[in-house]
C-alpha cells in the first residue's frame, strides 16, 4: 500500500486538474474584497471566467468559495465579498463554462471514493489508547476508525512494550474482542500485568472521511482521484456526452488501484469493530 498522505486540498486540486476543469491562479498584485488580479493566468481577451467558481487555496480566504461575476483584462471580480486578496494569494477556478463541476461536487466525490476503498482495503496502524488500562474496568474502547487488531501491548516502567497474549475465548486469560460493543477485554493475570500502564493496539483502520482541507488520506492518491473521477463522470452522463468514454476509463483505473490496495492480514487478526 502506498501511504501517500495527500491532504483534502491536494486531492481536490488534483481531481479538478484531472477533469480538465481547473485554472490555477496566483495574485501578482493586491486586489480587493471582490477582485483577484493575476497578470499571468487571467487574460480577458482569451477567456472569460464569468460564472466559474473561485476556490481560495491560501490564507486569509483559505477554503472560501465565490462566484466569478466579471473578467476584465487581468482581473477577476467575484461575489460575495471576502477578505482583500493580496500579492501571492492563490486560488483555483472550477466549473468550466458552467459545464464542469463545483467544489462541493469534488468534495463529495473524493469522500465517496474513500468510502468505496474502505470496503476493499484497510490501513496498517498502531493506536495508543488513553487513559491507561484499568484492570478493574477490564476493557479498552476501540478507536472509531480501527476495524481489526492482531496484537495488544502495554508499556512497563522501563519503557519496554510487552505483548498481552490473545485468549481463544471470552473469560480466558488474555485479550478478546467484542466487535458489537467496540471494546477489547483483557482478563486474568495479563490484565493485572497491564494495570496502570499505557496500552497500544496493532491493527488495521478505515480511512476517515475528509472534512478540513488539512485532513489527510493515506490511500494511494491516484486511485482515489480515479475513483472520484469515475463517480463524477457517471453522474454527468446526461449532461455531456464526452463523459461516456471517460467513465469506462476511470472505472477500470479505479478497480485496478483498489485491487492493489488489498492488505495481507496478520494471521492473528481479529475484528474489533463492526
Residue ranges and their predicted role:
Residues 1-65, 69, 75-83, 90-274:
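Glycine-enriched, solvent-exposed interface loops adjoining structured elements
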Amino acid at each position: 500500500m502506498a501511504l501517500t498522505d495527500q491532504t483534502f486540498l491536494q486531492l481536490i486540486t488534483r481531481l479538478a486538474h484531472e477533469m480538465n476543469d481547473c485554472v490555477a491562479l496566483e495574485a501578482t498584485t493586491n486586489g480587493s474584497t471582490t477582485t483577484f488580479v493575476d497578470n499571468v493566468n487571467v487574460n480577458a481577451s482569451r477567456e472569460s471566467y464569468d460564472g466559474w467558481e473561485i476556490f481560495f487555496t491560501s490564507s486569509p480566504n483559505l477554503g472560501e468559495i465565490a462566484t466569478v461575476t466579471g473578467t476584465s483584462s487581468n482581473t477577476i471580480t467575484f461575489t460575495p465579498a471576502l477578505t482583500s486578496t493580496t500579492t501571492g494569494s492563490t486560488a483555483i477556478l472550477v466549473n468550466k463554462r458552467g459545464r464542469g463541476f463545483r467544489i462541493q461536487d469534488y468534495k463529495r466525490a473524493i469522500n465517496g471514493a474513500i468510502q468505496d476503498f474502505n470496503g476493499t482495503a484497510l490501513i496498517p496502524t498502531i493506536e495508543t489508547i488513553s487513559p491507561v488500562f484499568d484492570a478493574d474496568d477490564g476493557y479498552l474502547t476501540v478507536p472509531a476508525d480501527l476495524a481489526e487488531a492482531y496484537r495488544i501491548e502495554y508499556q512497563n516502567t522501563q519503557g519496554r512494550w510487552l505483548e498481552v497474549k490473545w485468549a481463544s475465548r471470552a473469560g480466558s486469560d488474555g485479550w478478546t474482542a467484542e466487535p458489537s460493543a467496540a471494546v477489547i477485554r483483557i482478563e486474568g493475570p495479563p490484565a493485572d500485568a497491564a494495570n496502570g500502564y499505557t496500552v497500544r493496539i496493532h491493527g488495521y483502520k478505515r480511512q476517515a472521511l475528509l472534512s478540513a482541507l488539512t485532513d489527510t488520506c493515506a490511500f494511494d492518491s491516484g486511485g482515489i482521484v480515479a475513483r472520484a473521477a469515475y463517480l463524477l463522470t457517471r453522474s454527468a452522463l446526461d449532461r455531456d456526452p464526452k463523459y461516456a468514454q471517460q467513465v469506462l476509463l476511470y472505472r477500470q483505473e479505479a478497480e485496478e488501484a483498489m485491487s492493489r490496495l488489498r492488505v495481507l492480514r496478520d494471521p492473528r487478526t481479529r475484528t474489533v469493530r463492526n
